[in-house]
Amino acid sequence: MQLLAYMKPNKVITTAIQLSLPVGIYLGIISNSGWGWWVACIFFYTVIYTLIGNNIAYHRYFTHKQFEVSKPIQWLFLWTGAMGGIGDPISYATTHLVHHKYSDTPLDPHGPTRGLRSVLFCFYKRVSPKDTPLVGRRVIELTKKYGWLHNYYLIFLLVSIGIMWAIDYRIFLFCWLIPASLFTWGLGVAVLAQHWGFRARNTWADRWFPHYEGLHLNHHDAPMAPNTAFRKGEIDYTYQFSRIFNPKFDWRGQPDVTNIK
């Protein structure tokens, strides 16, 4: 049982990936790789691990299930989300749903209530059923389907990384180590910015960073809404990009925008 506990997602794994960024950049520089590898690095950071893996897959599909997709796309979502280094869908969804229920309180797992140091994942509050009781059908569904990944997450991650390394050291470096580390830092900063002032807010970043979910207040007002652009001039890049996966959206959670000012 103790060995199994080490294989499960934990804050140590994610923090280690975060802190590896200087090493990754140094190794990238001394590798004398062409600019194409650095372009690939930025692509994996912004599109693969952030926009697809976190925003679309882990956040909107696995956690809130705002839509349904085909089986091959589900596996793609599982891989892109897991390779970001932030755990499996079960741990992610549980933490996020607790965040929604106890937002900006001492029981919130992350954000300004945990202090600026929570930009590092090791300072997130550990989700405990005793402190933050949460019974959700979605978590039960995810546990039945992806319990194996929750139990053997570290093995899954190491095997995937090993395959990358075996194909080409630069694939490991520019398609995982550097971009995954950038992603974890970006996510750590995002959860602080989204609740700066101890309240959910829409941030200026939603217009200038397409890979960033900046309409966070809108999301908290309607967590099941597939499109969080409620007002004139707003655009939900994650929703727009997710349409390439031919999803079947559940529009029951979408508010009547005519009543929103």
Go through each PLM region and give its residues.
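Non-catalytic, topology-defining segments of multipass membrane proteins
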Residues: 1-187, 225-261
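Glycine/small-residue-rich hydrophobic helix-like segments
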Residues: 189-236
